[in-house]
């Protein structure tokens, strides 16, 4: 995302090329794991996997590169990933990232209530992804997801008085989940 912004500010193609290069290395390095979304090349990815925050930021970067280059392989890949998230890995509250183990996306339709992780930071990343996809496609469905995430999955992470913070945002609690003091 930062390199795409730097390209937009400076007009220097090397920044956009560098952003695409970093993304294109996924699936081709010695580290080829799902946790870091490096299990296969980004243009072949079709499922949200691994660490949810890292994934969301990478998907936002993919949307930036897709929009700025017009690369149809990138556009199709990010569309497939978005369909997977919204259709199979998205909570009614707008949360993403079902499991505390690895702070990660779970399997398709793995959406527990009591142990839902739904990290606040993943919700922020999901807002970024949907904003960029709206700019890319101009379809309201992206803003529908953005708004649900913003008003239910993101804002819920902060207490009404601003003094407490939820790192994870489970859907169900029997009193065991408490907001932590603000990290500041």
Residue ranges of predicted features:
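Glycan-recognition and catalytic cores of secretory/periplasmic carbohydrate-active enzymes
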Residues: 1-184
